[in-house]
Amino acid sequence: MPELPEVETTRRGLQVHLVGRTLQRVVVRQRQLRYPVPARVEAAVVGEEVVALERRAKYLLIRLGGGAWLLLHLGMSGSLRLVAETDAPGRHDHVDLVLNDGRAVRLTDPRRFGCLLLGDGDPQDHRLLRRLGPEPLGSAFDGAVLHRAARGRRVAVKALLMDATVVVGVGNIYANEALFRAGIRPDRAAGRIARARYDRLAGAVRAVLEAALAAGGTTLRDFTDGSGEPGYFAVNLSVYGASVCPVCGGALRQIRLAQRGTWFCPRCQR
């Protein structure tokens, strides 16, 4: 699944090509995504200038000059790529946002768990956005946020870290990596972790995500950035999918937490 670094990499790659352009038309080949593509989207955005391309959590927000906006999510296997308008679509190319320069932003989604929604007003009031927690790379996120959310809870700390109402964008790969950097077992009860350790964990989350952004995201199966290039952070993963601890040389343990593969070092993580 494209996680926060992958979505932000896509945003950065497309922003320079999209902002300031006009949407000439929208081509919808498949409406049945996670949520149906609105029937009025084609008529609503034609002739509108793109004034901003933003990200909130794992959602991309295309703001248009007339006040409307498009909200996109890449789902489990989706991507957005800049292509020539004349490029023949593939089987899983479901939507084209055609620009006034002969190019199009193409939504590809083999598993159809992504979405393209239309709205106006404040997008932060949308039902998909309004309950989201702070951005992990923003000033509102720190150890205090995690410590408050964990108070009195027996849930595993990894599950807390992946709860988008606590902090957004920390998916399975990066939760594994951040907990390793912070020296915290992923199955430890969240409410039994001291504030100082949460300070360390918040710093580890930031460091892991910043490193992934610098590398262009993590490619495991489907992710490509806005130009179709893969991300390269997978070569820098410390524990996710690995068998040997890079610090102590001991064997890593693999367990399942909340139905997700989880790796940790029983020596280095307590």
Curated annotation (Swiss-Prot):
SMART domains: Fapy_DNA_glyco, H2TH
Obligatory cofactor(s): Zn(2+)
Cofactor note: Binds 1 zinc ion per subunit.
Zinc finger (FPG-type) boundaries: 238-270
GO biological process, any: base-excision repair
SUPFAM superfamilies: Glucocorticoid receptor-like (DNA-binding domain) (SSF57716), N-terminal domain of MutM-like DNA repair proteins (SSF81624), S13-like H2TH domain (SSF46946)
Residues of the active site: P2 (schiff-base intermediate with dna), E3 (proton donor), K58 (proton donor), R260 (proton donor)
A Pfam cross-reference name: H2TH
Record GO terms (molecular function): 8-oxo-7,8-dihydroguanine DNA N-glycosylase activity; class I DNA-(apurinic or apyrimidinic site) endonuclease activity; damaged DNA binding; zinc ion binding
UniProt key word Nucleotide-binding: no
InterPro entries in the record: DNA_glyclase/AP_lyase_DNA-bd, DNA_glyclase_Znf_dom_DNA_BS, Formamido-pyr_DNA_Glyclase, FPG_cat, MutM-like_N-ter, Ribosomal_uS13-like_H2TH, Znf_DNA_glyclase/AP_lyase, Znf_FPG/IleRS
Binding positions (DNA): H92, R111, R153
E.C. numbers: 3.2.2.23, 4.2.99.18
Keywords, ordered alphabetically: DNA damage, DNA repair, DNA-binding, Glycosidase, Hydrolase, Lyase, Metal-binding, Multifunctional enzyme, Zinc, Zinc-finger
Catalyzed reactions per annotation: Hydrolysis of DNA containing ring-opened 7-methylguanine residues, releasing 2,6-diamino-4-hydroxy-5-(N-methyl)formamidopyrimidine; 2'-deoxyribonucleotide-(2'-deoxyribose 5'-phosphate)-2'-deoxyribonucleotide-DNA = a 3'-end 2'-deoxyribonucleotide-(2,3-dehydro-2,3-deoxyribose 5'-phosphate)-DNA + a 5'-end 5'-phospho-2'-deoxyribonucleoside-DNA + H(+)
Annotated function: Involved in base excision repair of DNA damaged by oxidation or by mutagenic agents. Acts as a DNA glycosylase that recognizes and removes damaged bases. Has a preference for oxidized purines, such as 7,8-dihydro-8-oxoguanine (8-oxoG). Has AP (apurinic/apyrimidinic) lyase activity and introduces nicks in the DNA strand. Cleaves the DNA backbone by beta-delta elimination to generate a single-strand break at the site of the removed base with both 3'- and 5'-phosphates.
Subunit-structure text: Monomer.
Family per record: Belongs to the FPG family.
NCBIfam families recorded: fpg, PRK01103.1
Record protein name field: Formamidopyrimidine-DNA glycosylase
